[in-house]
A protein has these predicted regions:
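Structured alpha/beta or helical-core interaction and ligand-binding surfaces enriched in interleaved
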Residues: 1-134, 139-153
Length: 153
């Protein structure tokens, strides 16, 4: 297994997870009336593997933290997230993985499609929703004024 990423393999149960980081992500980005249920599902072995479906549409996210993002290839997305956060490691909640991952790998996974939240810490993240028609919804997630927002994100 590539040591640059920790991958949740659903048939192996719950790997070592970072409960504090998961709660932080949910509290910072998810609307209040959905937080408790999602946190419970993340901590439940049987429910954890399907929790990502809560993130299929951006209406579950707090509106004040959403900054629409244009299409970016993996390299550009990594550059933008690194410039804002200064970190090469992130926490990912996605369709096939939940856990710590190198930023480059997380951006490549997002670029391939699929629902995901990439969290770089300090209230900085990226969201990609489910693709129904056209491009999937994509947003930079910025809690408060945690960093300088690039002119084009």
């Amino acid at each position: 297994m590539d040591e640059s990423r920790v991958v949740l393999k659903y048939n192996e149960g719950i790997p070592a997870m970072n409960k504090e980081t998961e709660v932080e992500i949910i509290k910072k980005f998810i609307v209040k009336n959905k937080q408790e249920r999602i946190i419970w599902k993340l901590q439940n072995a049987k429910k954890r593997k399907k929790v990502f479906w809560h993130f299929d549409h951006p209406d579950i996210l707090k509106k004040e933290i959403l900054y629409p993002s244009t299409y970016k290839d993996a390299e550009h997305l990594e550059k933008v997230l690194y410039e804002m956060s200064g970190t090469r490691e992130c926490y990912v909640i996605g369709e096939c993985y939940i856990g710590t991952m190198q930023l480059r790998q997380a951006c490549e996974e997002a670029w391939q499609g699929g629902i995901c939240i990439i969290y770089c810490g300090n209230g900085i993240g990226y969201y990609q929703g489910d693709q129904e028609k056209g491009a999937p919804p994509r947003f930079m997630l910025l809690k408060e004024k945690c960093c300088k927002i690039p002119s084009r994100i």
